[in-house]
Amino acid sequence: MGLVGWGLLLGCLGCGILLRARAQFPRVCMTLDGVLNKECCPPLGPEATNICGFLEGRGQCAEVQTDTRPWSGPYILRNQDDREQWPRKFFNRTCKCTGNFAGYNCGGCKFGWTGPDCNRKKPAILRRNIHSLTAQEREQFLGALDLAKKSIHPDYVITTQHWLGLLGPNGTQPQIANCSVYDFFVWLHYYSVRDTLLGPGRPYKAIDFSHQGPAFVTWHRYHLLWLERELQRLTGNESFALPYWNFATGKNECDVCTDELLGAARQDDPTLISRNSRFSTWEIVCDSLDDYNRRVTLCNGTYEGLLRRNKVGRNNEKLPTLKNVQDCLSLQKFDSPPFFQNSTFSFRNALEGFDKADGTLDSQVMNLHNLAHSFLNGTNALPHSAANDPVFVVLHSFTDAIFDEWLKRNNPSTDAWPQELAPIGHNRMYNMVPFFPPVTNEELFLTAEQLGYNYAVDLSEEEAPVWSTTLSVVIGILGAFVLLLGLLAFLQYRRLRKGYAPLMETGLSSKRYTEEA
């Protein structure tokens, strides 16, 4: 069997229903004792007493802090979902790292920092338009995605049951599974949007921790940063950066859906990916939401069929335009009450695509991010499965670029983000679900540069060409001249009807020239 064949085999095994102890929780913490004690504070290195790197001054084991402020929105239950007060249903003590140290055992650095002591600012990586990549850069990106699909995550596992069933039927076996790096990226997104499980066939659907609220921008930002760092590790290239797809073309075509990039449509079945693309063999995970709800279980990483896109019968739908992006960026308010999908004149809601790009609400309209997903259709059209499609990565990279442009233009204070009464998961200090160790929305409400990356993109107003400006001026002058001629003709007509009257009386008069004669 060749190298690729072994890679595919490992990829298939990587997300099976394997009850084995980075992704949702560190593998080292998902033991019977770890789950029962609700503590995830592993040692750093071989010294067992070096808990959270404490002996090196990197961190210590501490009580998890969660947001206790009230939320609003359609989720009205309490203590029914294991994502409430994340992650305390699973762990109430974790490593709290000091300074720029980060990670489940404080063994890494925060985004944007490097060095043994994490005290050296890392040169910012540059996210560029995917169409501007060289052939070598393009191959590195596509190859890294494929490698991530086939590589079991070395540190993290996923849970295959909700919190009440986490230890299995006999209460002694943690219900977990190994998963590939990319499939875990998919699983994170699924877990953030999945329904609350109340019983067989009784899902509570009014909940979403990564959409329909302020956390939409920060959640997806962290999601991409997580994947970018994993791809850097897989490729051994610390300067590796995710590209973006500028979907604001206003066209009726997906210009990244080619065999040179993320896969064209298959000729004999246009809902599938062309056999000339490496993505034609990608199988998807976490797609059978109704089945999970019926069985009161979670996505366990089993493959559920091939990746699909579906443009059939959608020939009149067009992608957003640059004007839509510019209108969205002109909105100065980050978000507005009720901080939900019906917020108006909210930059976040316009970017997410529930508002028109200018911030007005129209329930019949999809725009920007939502429109791009709808345009691709297929696997990409549903939140729980969308991240299976690699187009998701470059689509959200551009969405993040728009968010970053807004941050740079407006320089908002943290007070721009609601402390309370946003939907569950969307308050400023809520720990984003299901990232671990815990990270709040506020921690990602920063410019990209502060997090170690930048975008090579120009989202400013396009300057009109000289001939266009000149033509506009000439048309304006001609229009004013025609209007003046019409006004003079009207005045002459009235004067002839009333008879001659002097323009100015010789006597004093209180009548003003704006009044009727």
UniProtKB/Swiss-Prot annotation:
The protein's Enzyme Commission number: 5.3.3.12
Could you tell me the gene encoding this protein?
Dct
Regarding protein family, the annotation reads: Belongs to the tyrosinase family.
Q: How is it modified after translation?
A: Glycosylated.
Entry protein name: L-dopachrome tautomerase
Q: Could you tell me which InterPro entries the record lists for this protein? A: Di-copper_centre_dom_sf, Tyrosinase/Hemocyanin, Tyrosinase_Cu-bd
Q: In which pathway does it act?
A: Pigment biosynthesis; melanin biosynthesis
What tissues harbor this protein? Melanocytes and retinal pigmented epithelium (at protein level).
Q: Which residues are glycosylated?
A: 92, 170, 178, 237, 300, 342, 377
Q: Which residues cross the membrane?
A: 473-491
Q: Which residues bind Zn(2+) A?
A: 189, 211, 220
Superkingdom as given in the UniProt entry:
Eukaryota
Substrates-to-products reaction catalysed: L-dopachrome = 5,6-dihydroxyindole-2-carboxylate
Membrane topology value: Single-pass type I membrane protein
Signal peptide (UniProt feature, chain positions): 1-23
Task: Summarize the disease involvement recorded for this protein.
Answer: The slaty mutation in Tyrp2 leads to a decrease of DT activity and a consequent change in the pigmentation of the mice to a dark gray/brown eumelanin. The slaty-2j mutation has a similar phenotype, the slaty-lt (light) mutation has a more severe effect and is semidominant; its phenotype may be a result of the failure of the enzyme to be correctly targeted to its normal location on the inner face of the melanosomal membrane.
Q: How is the cofactor bound?
A: Binds 2 Zn(2+) ions per subunit.
Write out the entry's keywords from A to Z.
Answer: Disease variant, Glycoprotein, Isomerase, Melanin biosynthesis, Membrane, Metal-binding, Signal, Transmembrane, Transmembrane helix, Zinc
Q: Which residues lie on this side of the membrane: Cytoplasmic?
A: 492-517
Q: Kindly list the positions annotated as binding Zn(2+) B.
A: 369, 373, 396
Q: Which GO terms describe its biological process?
A: cell development; developmental pigmentation; melanin biosynthetic process; melanin biosynthetic process from tyrosine; neuroblast proliferation; pigmentation; positive regulation of neuroblast proliferation; response to blue light
Task: State its location(s).
Answer: Melanosome membrane; Melanosome
